[in-house]
Amino acid sequence: MFKNEVAEFIYKRTYSRWMEDEGRREEWPETIERFIDFLILKNGEKIPEKTVKKIRQYMLDFAVMPSMRFLWSAGPAAEKDNTVIYNCSFAKLNCVEAFAECLHILMCGTGFGFSVEEDEVSKLPSIPEIKSGKDIARVTIDDSREGWADSVKTLMTSLYEGQNLYFD
């Protein structure tokens, strides 16, 4: 099925999901079905059955491939957060939320390009002198992609407000 052993190894290592109930990894046709099932789940009637059949056959024949990140993540991971299906993204770093979004996107495995052009960065507020002493607040970080991204937003917001935080 695969052109060589290296291609099969890469498929098994990277794209073939473990099937707990069967105690084994997916085979290529099962990976394709997982991908197709996810497409149908998200698009329903928008994709004609004739087109679905063509996609399935072309993938079985290695004539066409989706984004490999999409193939890798189709199913529960992409249902939880579709950011994981993308290869790359871009944002202008002109607000606190952009920094948190950057971390979240990177933690999903998606590349992140950004602009730090002066006309964009100048939209960020100035960082005042940090207050010291009793103004320190303790912040606990939820150990998840969302938790870490939120912590960046909390940190940057506190800096712009002149607060000093302690991250636990």
Give the ranges of each region predicted by the language model:
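Extended catalytic cores of very large enzyme megasubunits
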Residues: 1-168
